[in-house]
Every structure is written in structure tokens, then in C-alpha cells.
């Protein structure tokens, strides 16, 4: 898939089971006021005005459903496009599958920047997406939105014994979308033999593991991750306020 030079492509890994939500279906396909989380996430990215194309990775048996829903939702939206691909066994592999649809950084048509966004952060406001892209265009090669912590954090061992209490002032709760210069993210995933040996919970961790510098920008409370039934209830209340 070729895109115009200088563009921003967002990748949405949405193939996970989401067992903590206990909905009986993949989490990204839970509905929030009649629209699935993945639909809300994809449309939110495109409507931000700074994302040119979205590649969403879903379970193989959900491809047709996702294509139909997005085609209906974007039918009257000029210049807004999404590609649906089969995801992998975990988040990292789903991102790999999505990246494989894009031209390599050295090829004509490669995007300038890539965002990676959780489908479960379905209420992420446009202002946060813009903030991440603005930081990329300002010269940072890896950008994550994050919020200060309000809770005290304890490090514990396997038996639940407290090992220490890190200073909260230097800690942040990281959100998505996370943004990267295309070449940096591409190289991180291409150096792939190590991917199965380390549990990377986000893409910035992978970049850090390879020595990359990651810039934090202000996050947004509305970009919370819908992981449990309580989160889903909160999201519904926010939409209906």
C-alpha cells in the first residue's frame, strides 16, 4: 500500500482477546453506544485532521465485518481511508502485520510518521493525537503521551512483599497514540529475533530497548484504556453526559 510522502499513517492492533473485559468477544468489537471500540478508535484518528490513513489489524474472522463497518462509516468522508489486515497472536505481531502493508522507509510512498494506537482507547480526543504529531514534526523521533500518577506505586516480589516505593514525581502512566519516525519504528521491528524473548507492552519500550530516545507529551484523561466492565461503564457515562 503506497501513501503520499510526508503523510502520517496510524496502526491500530485490534486482534487481542481482551479477557479482562469478559465480554465473550474480542475487546475491540465490544460496542459503546452502538459503535465498536475499534470503529471509534479508527474514526477518531482520521477525524483528528492529522492522520492520513489507518491500518487496523483484527482477527482473521473479523476482517469482513470490520471492512464493512468502516466502509459505511467513511463512505461520505473525503480523503479518509482505512485498510484492514489480519492481526497476529499478540500485539507485537499485529503491529508487524500492519507495518508489512506499508512501503519500507527507503521506498517511494512510505509515510513520514507512524502512530500506533490502542483500539481500547476509543474516546481519545483529537487534541491529543494532534499533540503527538506536532511533537514528531518538531523533530522528535519517538513520542508518547502520558499522565502523572495519582496513586502511590509499590514494587513487590512474587510473594507480594514490598521491595520499594519509587518516587512518584518521576513516573508517568503512558497512553496512546504513540508516534514514531517511520524509519525508527521500522528498524525496531526489523531487528526482530529478540521480539519473542522480551515482553514489550508498548512500542516505545521496543524503541527504548534498542537505545532510542522517547519524548513525553501531556496525555489526556479521556484517552483511558477500556479494559474492564467498570471502564466500559465509565465510557458510556462520558458519552451520555
From Swiss-Prot:
User: Which reactions is this enzyme annotated as catalysing?
Assistant: 2-C-methyl-D-erythritol 4-phosphate + CTP + H(+) = 4-CDP-2-C-methyl-D-erythritol + diphosphate
Provide the GO MF annotations for this entry: 2-C-methyl-D-erythritol 4-phosphate cytidylyltransferase activity
What the entry lists under InterPro entries is as follows: IspD (IPR001228), IspD/TarI (IPR034683), IspD/TarI_cytidylyltransf_bact (IPR050088), ISPD_synthase_CS (IPR018294), Nucleotide-diphossugar_trans (IPR029044)
Task: Identify the pathway.
Answer: Isoprenoid biosynthesis; isopentenyl diphosphate biosynthesis via DXP pathway; isopentenyl diphosphate from 1-deoxy-D-xylulose 5-phosphate: step 2/6
**Keyword terms of this UniProt record:** Isoprene biosynthesis, Nucleotidyltransferase, Transferase
Site described as Positions MEP for the nucleophilic attack, positions? 168, 225
Give the function comment from the record: Catalyzes the formation of 4-diphosphocytidyl-2-C-methyl-D-erythritol from CTP and 2-C-methyl-D-erythritol 4-phosphate (MEP).
Q: Which family does it belong to?
A: Belongs to the IspD/TarI cytidylyltransferase family. IspD subfamily.
Protein's name in the database: 2-C-methyl-D-erythritol 4-phosphate cytidylyltransferase
Organism annotation? Mycobacterium leprae (strain TN)
